């Protein structure tokens, strides 16, 4: 089978803000698993010179650009956060392009399985394109504490993001596997390592 025709076994990885998705994703990479991050793909499609960035500037004006021509994501978020119509326009522009980038990179996987990490895996419907869904879960107070420690933001803003995201119960309902990330990094790694071995058995690979 040629590489171009190869469709990997895909694990969808998701979780709410501050749940520990990034730490879980990093562990899969350390274990040699091919990983594609939806947030990275979202950055690729709006790089300077790409058609999507030109469309965004045409709609919102040059104020959404930084001095170096890169997209000012914070400025754009402010413009669309409280405007559902503008947010929908942006999603309709970017989601198909991001999807193309994601599955192009997933198709290059050389590991027994690939991981696709996205905070909107379920909301976007892309979990239907994966073979299994892993949810990284954490208590909401811990999600808030982690986000405040990581980002220069307010508790109110984090609460607003949590309310805008898929409800925790709905996310868990779509999960095939759940990692409860309410401890330290070692505990998270232990759970990811155990699941990695399990996923290799599903694929017939060797740990």
UniProtKB/Swiss-Prot annotation:
Pfam families per record: CoaE
Associated pathway: Cofactor biosynthesis; coenzyme A biosynthesis; CoA from (R)-pantothenate: step 5/5
Any one GO CC term of the record: cytoplasm
Major location (coarse): cytoplasm
GO term, biological process aspect, one: coenzyme A biosynthetic process
Subcellular location: Cytoplasm
Highest classification ranks of the organism: Bacteria, Pseudomonadati, Pseudomonadota, Gammaproteobacteria, Pseudomonadales
Any one Gene Ontology molecular-function term assigned to this protein's record: ATP binding
E.C. number(s) listed in UniProt: 2.7.1.24
Residues annotated as binding ATP: 18-23
Species annotation: Pseudomonas putida (strain ATCC 47054 / DSM 6125 / CFBP 8728 / NCIMB 11950 / KT2440)
Family: Belongs to the CoaE family.
Keywords: ATP-binding, Coenzyme A biosynthesis, Cytoplasm, Kinase, Nucleotide-binding, Transferase
PROSITE patterns linked: DPCK
Protein name stated in the entry: Dephospho-CoA kinase
All residue ranges annotated as the DPCK domain in the record: 10-207
Enzymatic reactions: 3'-dephospho-CoA + ATP = ADP + CoA + H(+)
Function summary: Catalyzes the phosphorylation of the 3'-hydroxyl group of dephosphocoenzyme A to form coenzyme A.
């Amino acid at each position: 089978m040629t590489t171009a025709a190869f469709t990997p076994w895909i694990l969808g990885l998701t979780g709410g803000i501050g749940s520990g998705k990034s730490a879980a994703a990093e562990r899969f990479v350390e274990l040699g698993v091919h990983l594609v991050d939806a947030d990275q793909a979202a950055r690729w499609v709006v790089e300077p010179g790409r058609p999507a960035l030109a469309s965004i500037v045409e709609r919102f004006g040059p104020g959404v650009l930084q001095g170096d021509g890169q997209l000012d994501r914070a400025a754009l978020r402010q413009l669309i956060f409280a405007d559902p119509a503008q947010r929908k326009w942006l999603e309709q522009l970017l989601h198909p392009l991001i999807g193309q980038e994601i599955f192009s990179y997933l198709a290059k996987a050389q590991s027994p399985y690939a991981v696709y990490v996205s905070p909107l895996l379920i909301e976007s419907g892309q979990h239907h394109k994966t073979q299994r869904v892993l949810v990284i879960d954490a208590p909401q107070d811990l999600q808030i504490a982690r986000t405040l420690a990581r980002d220069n933001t307010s508790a109110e803003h984090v609460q607003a993001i949590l309310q805008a995201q898929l409800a925790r119960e709905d996310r868990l309902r779509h999960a095939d596997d759940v990692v409860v990330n309410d401890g330290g990094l070692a505990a998270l790694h232990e759970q990811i390592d155990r699941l990695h071995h399990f996923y290799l058995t599903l694929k017939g690979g060797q740990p």
